[in-house]
Amino acid sequence: MANLHPTAWVAPGAYLRGDVTLGEQTNVWYNAVLRADQEKITIGAFSNVQDNCVLHGCTVEDKCLIGMNSVILDHAVIGEGSIVGAGAVVAAGTIVPPRSLVVGIPAKVKKTLTDEDVAGSVANADSYLGLMTIGQADPENQG
């Protein structure tokens, strides 16, 4: 039973199962899998879950970017404004502080994001919002 904000977008081929909540202007890209069949998944506003990610019962706060091919396991929390680097695996129960860059297997905090980093991430998110709008308007992208 997905609970999607009216401005959220899920790409064709992405799969949401169970108790998933997507916030305002959040987008989930191609072939991502959000498995909330055992634990709830909450993705905050203005967040971006990129292609081929796998999320289990976790919380992703507002304005986060979850890089391509990342995995986030049960009970992990990704703090507001954080970036999970492409291919990272966030272990079960990991608490990522706000404004963190996490990378690796298992994912570790690489650095705290500066205001400049956050501004760049917000600009990147804005570009994805544009792509999301194109995807919504293009009948070829509707599954």
What are these regions, as identified by a protein language model?
Residues 40:
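Phosphate/pyrophosphate-binding betaalpha-module
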Residues 3, 54, 60, 71, ...:
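C-terminal segments of enzyme domains that contribute to small-molecule binding surfaces
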